[in-house]
């Protein structure tokens, strides 16, 4: 709820959604739940396995009420020996292998790292949505709904790229490689010596605006990079991509690039590279992203007048891309829990307001 405890992390997580409260254990609430099921396309739940079945609202019960119903269990580990394990984003990143390949190699003092964002929560939602679209396609052909079983933890393995095939084929466990690329070189992020905003009050600007991305893995680009940075000895040593993509070579190459950049700002490094025809960009923070003319022109980051919270800077629904015929719509950034009880219970399901007031008095909603 605004000002009473709902965390800022909820912003942008559930735009355009109605929010109600419901106690499934009560008969009156169960009746309302079943009424929603009969008129809905489906639901997604992530309770421990068997919970909804005990409450007589699992797929086997709901499909009898609505044969077209699409039911998603977004379980933690999914069915199997650990099906009763809980589900948290950090658990998925850790247990499914993602954290082990995130961060710098221990050669430079790195360690396994959790992604700052809740990427597994977001990625799980994306994969579940894809499954729902497939279920809708199936329903159009057959007229029937289906149940989708999903493991949130295993969603992280889809972020690991070639890690599993690499181990299966060669027995090699993929390592952390930080801001470099295991398949391309030079193709990474380097630390520059000076900040673009040395006098800024915000430490994110003053201290962190020192990183630049440089890409020069093609032989001609690599030659040009070595020329403008004075690394002729490295060009002679690593003329072919096969030579410079090796781990030992990358360690030497990126150390030399950061040595070259130690008396330069991020902007200076990017300009030198871009003037030479190379791909280079600064690593931007949120403020710079917001101020970027490109994104503002596209309209993918914009201000909105949220009906509950007022002016909010957001990108939800607009950042998905530009659609040729379907307009992008964002009606609200989020809603307080229970904000739409009257709309759903009274306007949609037809319960009298006196009944809803009674539920409030009894603390049922």
What are these regions (language model features)?
Residues 1, 89, 166-175, 229, ...:
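Short, surface-exposed loop/helix-turn segments at secondary-structure junctions
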Residues 1-144, 336, 342-365:
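N-terminal helix-loop segment corresponding to the beta1-alpha1 unit
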Residues 76-79, 152-158, 194-196, 216-221, ...:
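Glycine-rich beta-alpha junction loops
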Residues 98, 124-127, 148-157, 217:
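NAD(P)-dependent dehydrogenases' Rossmann-like dinucleotide-binding region
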Residues 112-123, 147, 178, 185-187, ...:
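A short glycine-threonine-serine/GTX helix/turn-capping micro-motif
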Residues 135-179, 286:
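Substrate-binding/catalytic subdomain of NAD(P)-dependent oxidoreductase enzymes
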Residues 180-185, 191-196, 205-206, 288-365:
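Terminal low-complexity tails and localization/encapsulation signals of metabolic enzymes
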């Amino acid at each position: 709820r605004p000002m009473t405890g709902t965390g800022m992390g909820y912003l942008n997580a559930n735009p355009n959604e109605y929010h109600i409260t419901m106690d499934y254990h009560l008969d009156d609430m169960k009746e309302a739940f079943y009424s929603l099921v009969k008129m809905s396309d489906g639901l997604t739940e992530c309770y421990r396995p068997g919970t909804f079945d005990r409450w007589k609202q699992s797929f086997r019960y709901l499909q009898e009420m609505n044969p077209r119903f699409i039911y998603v269990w977004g379980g933690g580990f999914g069915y199997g020996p650990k099906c009763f394990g809980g589900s948290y984003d950090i658990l998925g990143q850790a247990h499914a292998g993602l954290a082990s390949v995130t961060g710098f190699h221990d050669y430079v003092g790195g360690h396994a790292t959790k992604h700052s964002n809740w990427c597994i929560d977001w990625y799980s939602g994306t994969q579940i949505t894809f499954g729902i679209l497939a279920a809708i396609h199936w329903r159009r052909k057959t007229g029937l709904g289906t149940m989708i079983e999903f493991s949130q933890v295993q969603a992280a393995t889809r972020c690991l790229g070639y890690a599993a095939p690499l181990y299966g084929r060669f027995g090699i466990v993929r390592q952390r490689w930080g801001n470099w690329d295991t398949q391309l070189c030079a193709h990474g992020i380097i630390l520059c010596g000076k900040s673009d905003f040395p006098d800024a009050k915000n430490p994110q600007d003053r201290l962190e605006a020192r990183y630049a991305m440089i890409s020069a893995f093609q032989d001609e680009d690599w030659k040009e990079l070595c020329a403008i940075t004075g690394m002729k000895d490295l060009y002679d040593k690593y003329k072919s991509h096969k030579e410079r993509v090796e781990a030992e070579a990358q360690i030497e190459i990126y150390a030399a690039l950061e040595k070259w950049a130690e008396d330069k700002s991020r902007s200076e490094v990017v300009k030198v590279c871009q003037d030479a025809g190379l791909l280079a960009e600064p690593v931007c923070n949120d403020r710079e992203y917001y101020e970027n003319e490109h994104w503002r022109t596209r309209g993918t980051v914009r201000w909105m007048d949220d009906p509950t919270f007022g002016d909010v800077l957001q990108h939800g629904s607009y950042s998905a891309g530009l659609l040729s015929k379907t307009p992008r719509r964002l009606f609200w950034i989020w809603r307080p829990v229970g904000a739409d009880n009257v709309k759903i219970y009274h306007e949609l399901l037809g319960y009298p307001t006196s009944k809803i007031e009674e539920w409030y008095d009894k603390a049922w909603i």
